[in-house]
């Protein structure tokens, strides 16, 4: 019985290490269930990484007495709040899979630019020791979502909305209070957006493939 969790962890790690099939013609060779499983695992990994980073940054730079008021001020800060994306599991269940994939793609793409500056901000690895790989992880998830869109749209995806607006760059001047608050807000949005993307992918996976892990 003790081998169960270990086996599950090893399987999850193995799936995370699997690359997406790059050639369009080869996508049908990978079952849809595997595409969804890989996408969900990658989204979960990124969301956890973002949550851990936010907490570490908070502990390192934001006084405990100021956190609550700052978090309230950040409520309307995230760009993702300006697009008509579902805000939770219940709303996500009312949308089609293609809609949820498009929202997921928009959320991921909005961070491709800003995260390239993370390694310059956290050069001491105090907060984000793997920051130089976050861009690669986001690109990997982007490819997985695009693969799912091709599968669900019979290999001929319609021209989707192109995200023109994105988040600001992270500020490298950590001696400035304004810069610290800006980075704190960006990390909060990064965490929220990845949580949304993970939720959308899990909703789609669960309603297509009935599983015991669908309660979340």
UniProtKB/Swiss-Prot annotation:
Residues 1-26 form the signal peptide. Its main location: secreted. Disulfide bonds join 78-189, 206-214. PROSITE patterns: SOMATOTROPIN_1, SOMATOTROPIN_2. The modification Phosphoserine is found at residue 131. Keywords: Disulfide bond, Hormone, Metal-binding, Phosphoprotein, Secreted, Signal, Zinc. InterPro entries: 4_helix_cytokine-like_core (IPR009079), Somatotropin (IPR034975), Somatotropin/Prolactin (IPR001400), Somatotropin_CS (IPR018116). GO terms for biological process: animal organ development; growth hormone receptor signaling pathway; growth hormone receptor signaling pathway via JAK-STAT; positive regulation of receptor signaling pathway via JAK-STAT; response to nutrient levels. Pfam families: Hormone_1. It is found in: Secreted. GO terms for cellular component: extracellular space. It comes from the Eukaryota. The keyword Signal applies. The keyword Metal-binding applies. Zn(2+) binds at residues 45, 198. GO terms for molecular function: growth factor activity; growth hormone receptor binding; hormone activity; metal ion binding. Gene3D superfamilies: 1.20.1250.10. Belongs to the somatotropin/prolactin family. Plays an important role in growth control. Its major role in stimulating body growth is to stimulate the liver and other tissues to secrete IGF1. It stimulates both the differentiation and proliferation of myoblasts. It also stimulates amino acid uptake and protein synthesis in muscle and other tissues. This is Somatotropin. It comes from Sus scrofa (Pig). The gene is GH1.
């Amino acid at each position: 019985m003790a081998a169960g969790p270990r086996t599950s962890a090893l399987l999850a790690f193995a799936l995370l290490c699997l690359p997406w099939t790059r050639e369009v013609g080869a996508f049908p060779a990978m079952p849809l269930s595997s595409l969804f499983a890989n996408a969900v695992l990658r989204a979960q990994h990124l969301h956890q990484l973002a949550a851990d980073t936010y907490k570490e940054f908070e502990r390192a730079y934001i006084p405990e007495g100021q956190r609550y008021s700052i978090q309230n001020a950040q409520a309307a800060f995230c760009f993702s709040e300006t697009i008509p994306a579902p805000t939770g599991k219940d709303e996500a269940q009312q949308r089609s899979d293609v809609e949820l994939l498009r929202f997921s793609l928009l959320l991921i793409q909005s961070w491709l630019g800003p995260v390239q500056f993370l390694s310059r901000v956290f050069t001491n690895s105090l907060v984000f020791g793997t920051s130089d790989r976050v861009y690669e992880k986001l690109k990997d998830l982007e490819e997985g979502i695009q693969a799912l869109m091709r599968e669900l749209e019979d290999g001929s995806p319609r021209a989707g909305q192109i995200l023109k607006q994105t988040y600001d760059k992270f500020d490298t001047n950590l001696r400035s209070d304004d810069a610290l608050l800006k980075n704190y807000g960006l990390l909060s949005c990064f965490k929220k957006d990845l949580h949304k993307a993970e939720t959308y992918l899990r909703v789609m996976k669960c309603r297509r493939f009935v599983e015991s892990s669908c309660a979340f």
